From Swiss-Prot:
This is Probable peptidoglycan muropeptide transporter SLC46. GO terms for molecular function: peptidoglycan transmembrane transporter activity; transmembrane transporter activity. The chain crosses the membrane at residues 58-78, 128-148, 159-179, 197-217, 230-250, 259-279, 320-340, 363-383, 390-408, 451-471, 484-504. InterPro entries: MFS, MFS_trans_sf. Induction: Up-regulated upon E.coli infection. Belongs to the major facilitator superfamily. SLC46 family.
Length: 519
């Protein structure tokens, strides 16, 4: 998972029986009653077969976001500590330096000798981190091909529980490795941490929880409420990351990596137990059995169904818009994956930050966009009063915020300028929920799972390229200008802005049809 849980949060599966009418078809009668002829893709319309339209909401339906918050708390509580342990054990076990010397890395006790060792160790540690990212990508990418269909057939809750179990096992194994390193003065190879990723990878990583979570939201919410619920989901991610980052540095200074990893494991297994007891299934059994017959769950039929859904022609400019918005989401995931693989190392080599200083920065960096994200509901409400493109506006503003923040990081010469970059990135949390909402509104309910499954696969595969590329850029510029990768990130966000501009242009050519989608 990335600090962007980013990343990870990307998939919506169908919540409608296959025997029911397609929403765009079922609403033909209401279309004829409108003088404008607007499509029934309108977000405020509910259709037969949608679970949220046919049964009352229970309080358990609102427990999803707290569980996601706990997962992201546990993840970020250990994230920076894990990176630091990889560097420390690369120094001791990888290069054979004494424990007393390696303990000084990443502290304020900087000498010419420790700076030389840091520059020698970092490329090696970057390779270990890259290997971990690659292992985390391969199997989840394969699982993602079928995640939408599995979620449609077996329900959302089993996928959520699988993902939580994977993360819990990762931190349990990491705690065991850190415990051994603690009692051998670091003489445990950092490559053992790659082993901790294997159970997480086999159980789907962030792909499965993203599938299940956003499918769950699509099942239990509809109309304009869906965009608000998407923001609440994104906010839960940011608050979880914030709390994890806030406590991580202090816990690490007071204890050690073994305790930090153990706390993360306990939090996730506790959430898993409560989820099994309290979280209801959002997709009724009757919908699951009728929407995806058992005979259609074979690998071949799933792949055929996925391909036919993703490649079929669509009315107006829907296929172009879907593809373009998906590319924007892929660009943001690409930058997040790549940047996060080297950013902590960049801050250590450029400004000599400690773990505590970095986690304090992370706390502020998460808090500011989280507050802006919580205000996203107010922004949407206000924009809907004065424009018919509120969702598209917010996505564009968010990408501009990303771009300016990356440029500031790239050209920063002092530590305080990194905090200025946080202010420039105040709206960066809004692009994902806004793009997901646009895609959801463009699709009928029985196609969301497959379209977003494809997106999830591509996002899961993106670290194969992004992490490799960013590590290569960072190691090549380590001794000259290590922050140049931030400028590359700004360039990619600029491409995203141009792509959303083309969506705006296409939308303006058919306002009657597309206003309900982007409002």
């Amino acid at each position: 998972m990335n600090e962007e849980p980013h990343a990870h949060e990307n998939l919506v599966a169908k919540a409608q029986r296959s025997g029911d009418a397609d929403p765009e078809v079922a609403s033909t009668a209401s279309e004829k009653q409108r003088s404008s002829g607007a499509s029934a893709i309108a977000v405020g319309t509910e259709f037969p077969g949608n679970p949220q339209a046919s049964r009352p909401q229970s309080l358990g339906m609102y427990l999803l976001e707290p569980f996601i918050l706990i997962l992201l708390f546990a993840y970020n509580f250990s994230s920076t500590v894990l990176k630091n342990e990889v560097i420390y054990q690369s120094c001791t076990a990888g290069f054979g330096y004494p424990d007393s010397v390696c303990q000084l890395l990443g502290t304020k006790n900087i000498t010419n000798e420790t700076k030389r060792i840091e520059e020698q160790v970092q490329p090696y540690a970057a390779q270990v981190t890259l290997a971990m990212r690659l292992v985390e990508c391969f199997i989840p990418a394969f699982c993602g091909l079928f995640a939408g269909s599995w979620a449609d057939h077996y329900g959302r809750k089993p996928l959520l529980m699988c993902s939580f179990l994977g993360y819990g096992l990762q931190y349990l194994i990491s705690a065991a490795i850190a415990y051994c390193a603690m009692y051998t003065q670091g003489l445990v190879s950092p490559w053992w941490y790659v082993l901790s990723i294997v159970p997480l990878s086999c159980l789907g990583s962030s792909v499965t929880y993203s599938v299940a979570a956003v499918c769950f939201i699509a099942d239990v919410s509809g109309g304009k409420v869906r965009s608000y619920r998407m923001i609440a989901y994104e906010l839960a991610i940011y608050v979880g990351l914030l709390l994890g980052s806030l406590g991580s540095g202090y816990a690490y200074e007071a204890t050690d990596a073994y305790i930090v990893f153990s706390i993360s494991a306990v939090c996730i297994f506790t959430a898993l137990f409560l989820m099994a007891l309290l979280l209801p299934e959002s997709l009724p059994a009757r919908n699951r059995t009728l929407s995806t017959p058992t005979t259609d769950t074979s690998v071949v039929s799933m792949l055929k169904s996925l391909w036919s859904t993703c490649s079929k022609p669509r009315e107006h400019q829907n296929r172009f818009m879907l593809t373009t918005i998906m590319v924007v989401l892929l660009l943001t995931a690409f930058v997040s994956d790549g940047s996060n693989s080297v950013f902590y190392k960049f801050m250590r080599i450029k400004f000599h930050w400690t773990v505590k200083q970095f986690t304090e920065y992370e706390t502020v960096g998460i808090l500011v966009p989280a507050v802006a994200g919580s205000g996203g509901v107010l922004f949407i409400w206000s924009l809907r009063k004065c424009t018919n493109s509120a969702i598209l506006w917010l996505a564009l503003v968010s990408l501009l915020s990303h771009c300016s923040s990356s440029l500031m990081k790239g050209f920063a010469l002092e530590s305080w300028q990194i905090y200025v970059a946080i202010g420039l990135g105040v709206f960066k949390s809004l692009v994902n929920p806004m793009c997901r909402t646009m895609i959801t509104n463009l699709l009928p309910a029985d196609e969301r799972g497959k379209i977003f499954a494809l997106l999830g696969v591509l996002q899961a595969l993106s670290p194969l390229i992004s992490s490799t590329l960013y590590v290569a850029i960072y190691t090549r510029t380590l001794n000259t200008e290590p922050g140049i990768f931030n400028v590359f990130s700004a360039f990619l966000f600029g491409i995203g802005i141009i792509l959303l501009g083309t969506v705006w242009h296409k939308k303006s050519r058919n306002l009657v049809y597309y206003e309900p989608v982007f409002k």
